[in-house]
Curated annotation (Swiss-Prot):
It is found in: Cell membrane. This is Probable potassium transport system protein Kup 2. The gene is kup2. It comes from Lactococcus lactis subsp. cremoris (strain MG1363). It is a multi-pass membrane protein. HAMAP family: Kup (MF_01522). It comes from the Bacteria. The chain crosses the membrane at residues 18-38, 60-80, 103-123, 149-169, 173-193, 218-238, 252-272, 292-312, 343-363, 373-393, 402-422, 424-444. GO terms for cellular component: plasma membrane. The keyword Membrane applies. The keyword Hydrolase does not apply. Keywords: Cell membrane, Ion transport, Membrane, Potassium, Potassium transport, Symport, Transmembrane, Transmembrane helix, Transport. Its main location: membrane. It catalyses: K(+)(in) + H(+)(in) = K(+)(out) + H(+)(out).
Length: 671
């Protein structure tokens, strides 16, 4: 859920309001894991009848220390310090370290893709797990179809309201999650009194012992189920900019205590009832009195919806960052909220809705979804650790500390990844295939941009200033527009895309009073909004470099209005008097934006792989948004022109005139 990014003085500060906001945004995923994590652990052992005291203590101990080592140590104590001007997440981390090694784009792409794929499964498993609590309400629950239909209706409603923004209901998220965590803590504490020996689980001995114990039927692979307790840790880092480091530091101890108490309460209940035969057991709901189940189902459903909303909003943010980093194609982006960061991407919303609904229909139960859940997020965490290692190197952290942290995290997360591999055949392959598809698109888009930059030819604009000056005074040509603006992807000092000058001078001479060449540069800082102007020693050629952060909207006309006003007030740009206008004394003329698109020709000199990449990109572009909407040009006068990408490879086809008389019957006539 988008929020206004925080200023320096408030980023490290904790407030009561910030505490509630953090509960509503950051902890939805990790806070709903008690709904299904212990259920997966019990099922992996073969059910309640097969549980021993040492197994239960070991399982709860693994839960406690997984939350401690992964969430607390890695994310809260280490990753939160790796902020990019107060923003977190894998792409923010990548922008901090991408200049250290070119290949670091690989873990960034893999981590981003698996995080997006995981975001499609999380709403399905959390909402389904909550609704399955109805199994304990006989007059409501009839069969699993009831759960599936209810889940699909809730998800449909959730995705349909995205276009209106989350701000209307977002203010309720914090108080609801406060009640949710309070319930987890209180109910867990009460149930812990069923068998206080559960407190032994704090000792890591029981966790280590269980991994090698013959009583553990799943063996090492139990870690695949254990990892479910910390799948939301990555979201904690991604939402850093939304709530601030101070609020996370204060709220996480409260959240962690409540979650651990919930697991301890479930563990104590299992100790008190071990040896019993209960089918389709979910300890989370089993610990409740019958008359409370329906109310807890409602509360857990609200918590699941909030967790899903946070992941959906996070997916929008992740995609928008990938677009600005040239890792994904352009998609239509809307900003339904009034605060910076609230955005809505219809294509992503629809894809998530379809994929999430498919997961509900395909897996049917939360038990089956859990089997596919954790593999993708373990990959994301490994990629984050890779980037985090280079961040520590960049910051000058002592080598021994880097080695200790990195090797430790790689060993722990590598173990979870290896244990989760067994889930591949149980459904995780679907999530992996989705992630691979996203990685493929990212690779094509990023690689194609590099190829295009290689083939685009540049010309020195100084050599054409006289022609442009002559053209603007040549009244034999109609005035094309007072101001003609070209958006260029490549502009280096006085060098400019050949295709742009080709459009102005060759394709159809475009007479104008002023020629603008605008290049948008995405900065490593998230919220930069600056510009640099070069008049090229003229008053009719303006080169503009827009420096926009990777989380800023690239709405060129809005920025250009400010730049024009600044230039005229400083006397660098002549005033453009308008005789006809509804605005008295208007000093700025009309504008036309020209978007030049390079199209791939059948370039014989281009290697086959490069041709494949560009042809694939062309097919992908057919289903994505145009630059017109991306750059905010939909309400401006716009001309889209097409030029061949490889101008240097255009050759004249050889053909010779036949001198002898040709019989008219030799060739059919064409009309």
């Amino acid at each position: 859920m988008g929020q206004v990014h925080l200023h320096n003085r408030s980023f490290n500060k904790a407030t009561s309001a910030g505490f509630l906001i953090a509960l509503g945004i950051v902890y939805g995923d990790i806070g709903t894991s008690p709904l299904y994590a212990m259920q997966a652990i019990v099922r992996g052992q073969g059910g309640l009848a097969n549980l021993s005291e040492s197994f239960i203590l070991g399982a709860v101990s693994l839960v406690i220390w997984t939350l401690t080592l992964i969430t607390t140590v890695k994310y809260v104590l280490i990753a939160l310090k790796a902020d990019n001007h107060h923003e977190g997440g894998i792409f923010s981390l990548f922008t901090l370290v991408r200049r250290m090694r070119k290949w670091l784009i690989v873990p960034a792409m893999i981590g981003g893709a698996t995080l997006l794929a995981d975001g499609a499964l999380t709403p399905a498993v959390t909402v389904t797990s909550a609704i399955e609590g109805l199994r304990g309400v006989t007059h409501v629950y009839s069969n699993q179809t009831t759960v599936m239909v209810t889940t699909l209706i809730i998800l449909a409603f959730l995705f349909l309201i995205q276009r209106f923004g989350a701000s209307l209901v977002g203010r309720l998220f914090g108080p609801i999650m406060f009640i949710w965590f309070g319930f987890l803590g209180v109910s867990g504490l009460i149930n812990s009194f069923l068998d206080l020996s559960i407190l032994k689980a704090i000792n890591p001995y029981y966790a280590i012992h269980l991994l090698f114990s013959p009583e553990n039927k799943a063996g090492f692979f139990i870690l695949g189920s254990i990892f479910l307790v910390t799948t939301g840790a990555e979201a904690l880092y991604s939402d850093l900019g939304h709530v601030g480091r101070g609020n996370i530091y204060v709220s996480w101890p409260f959240v962690k205590i409540c979650i651990i108490l919930s697991y301890c309460g479930q563990g104590a209940w299992l100790l008190a009832h071990r040896g019993e035969h209960i089918e389709k057991l979910n300890p989370f709901f089993a610990v409740l009195p019958d008359n409370m189940v329906i109310y807890v189902v409602i509360l857990s459903t609200l918590a699941a919806i909030i967790a899903s909303q946070a992941l959906i909003s996070g997916s929008f943010t992740l995609v928008s960052e990938a677009i600005r980093l040239k890792l994904l194609p352009l998609f239509k982006i809307y900003y339904p909220g009034q605060t910076l960061g609230q955005l809505y991407i219809p294509a992503v919303n629809f894809a998530l809705w379809v994929t999430t609904s498919f997961f509900v229909l395909y897996f049917k139960t939360s038990e089956h979804m859990e089997a596919a859940y954790s593999l993708a997020i373990t990959i994301t965490m490994l990629m984050t650790t890779t980037l985090l290692t280079y961040f520590l190197i960049q910051k000058g952290t002592p080598k021994i500390a880097i080695a200790f942290i990195s090797i430790g995290l790689f060993c722990i997360e590598g173990s979870f990844f290896a244990a989760s591999l067994v889930q591949f055949i149980n459904g995780a392959y679907i999530v992996v295939l989705i992630a691979l598809a996203i990685i493929f698109v990212m690779f094509i888009w990023n690689k194609s941009h590099k190829i295009v930059m290689k083939y685009i030819k540049s010309l020195n604009i100084n050599e054409y200033k006289n022609q442009l000056n002559a053209l603007r005074h040549d009244e034999s040509y109609d005035l094309y527009q007072t101001n003609v603006v070209y958006l260029t992807s490549k502009m280096d000092h006085e060098w400019i895309d050949r295709s742009i000058l080709y459009s102005i001078l060759d394709k159809r001479p475009k007479r104008a009073e002023c020629y603008w060449f605008v290049n948008v540069k995405v900065t490593d800082e998230p919220y930069t909004s600056e510009y640099k102007v070069d008049m090229m020693d003229t008053d009719f050629i303006v080169r503009v470099n827009l420096y926009l952060g990777f989380r800023m909207r690239q709405e060129v006309p809005r920025y250009l209005r400010t730049i024009v006003t600044d230039l005229m007030e400083s006397g660098r740009l002549p005033r453009q008097h308008q005789h006809y206008s509804i605005t008295p004394g208007r000093k700025v003329g009309d504008f036309r934006f020209v978007v030049v698109e390079e199209k791939l020709m059948n370039a014989r000199q281009m290697p086959g792989f490069e041709r494949f990449v560009l042809q694939t990109k062309a097919q992908i572009k057919r289903i994505t948004a145009s630059p017109i909407r991306w750059f905010g040009l939909q309400f401006s006068e716009v001309t889209v022109e097409t030029v061949p990408l490889v101008l240097s490879d255009v050759r004249n086809l050889e053909i010779h005139e036949r001198l002898e008389q040709v019989d008219e019957t030799e060739a059919p006539a064409t009309n």
